[in-house]
């Protein structure tokens, strides 16, 4: 059976807006995706709260994308790798420039291609942050107006990198908005929409 690695942050993990709990397997997009794939594909969930893509996270290796990704890629063979990560690098503590952000996401793509040269990559662009939700929610200490402004530039960056490295691009801005409850995470309805869209792209990729 072919395997898919879903590598990402809290929105891959299934973080429920504001509450901090986790959506169950039938609600988070990775679980729904497995249901849609049935016995055709095995979905491996690798989402982690607060995980950055390319910035060294003070929380540790598990939360630092480029350091922990090789662990998954060396452990088993994946036919398809979904990279759904990047928004945590915009936290106000880190302040990457847009150029540094582009170089960082490209670093993650190169690691993936080096360790899994035959795998197909689906690059997922995060949805733009919601400023009102950020300001009124529990993540106001991690993100600010500059974080939100930079998130509006991500679609161009991900599109450029997807074209450069022959990755399939899925731009979440076209299918799902973040919840106004915290300005960062997705509602259950959005998780369903994301799973259905990714499944369509998987069928085109296989």
Model-derived segments and spans:
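Serine-esterase "nucleophile elbow" of acetyl-processing enzymes
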Residues: 1-59, 71-75, 164, 192-193
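Alpha-helical cap/lid subdomain in secreted, periplasmic
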Residues: 63-206
């Amino acid at each position: 059976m072919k395997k898919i690695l879903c590598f990402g942050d809290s929105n891959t993990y299934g973080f429920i807006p504001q509450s901090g709990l986790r959506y169950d397997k039938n609600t988070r997009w990775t679980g729904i995706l497995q249901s849609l794939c049935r016995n055709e594909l095995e979905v491996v969930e690798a989402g982690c709260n607060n995980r950055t893509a390319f910035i060294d996270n003070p929380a540790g290796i598990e939360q630092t994308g480029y350091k922990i990704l090789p662990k998954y890629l060396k452990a088993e063979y994946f036919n398809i790798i979904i990279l759904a990560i990047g928004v945590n690098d915009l936290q106000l503590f880190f302040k990457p420039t847009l150029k540094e952000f582009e170089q960082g996401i490209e670093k993650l793509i190169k690691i993936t291609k080096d360790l899994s040269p035959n795998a197909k990559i689906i690059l997922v662009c995060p949805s733009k942050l919601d400023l009102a939700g950020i300001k009124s929610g529990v993540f106001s200490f991690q993100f600010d107006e500059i974080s939100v402004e930079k998130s509006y530039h991500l679609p161009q960056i991900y599109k450029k990198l997807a074209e450069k490295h022959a990755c399939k691009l899925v731009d979440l801005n076209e299918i799902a908005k973040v919840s106004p409850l915290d300005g960062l995470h997705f509602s259950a309805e959005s998780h369903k929409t994301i799973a259905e869209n990714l499944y369509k792209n998987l069928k085109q990729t296989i």
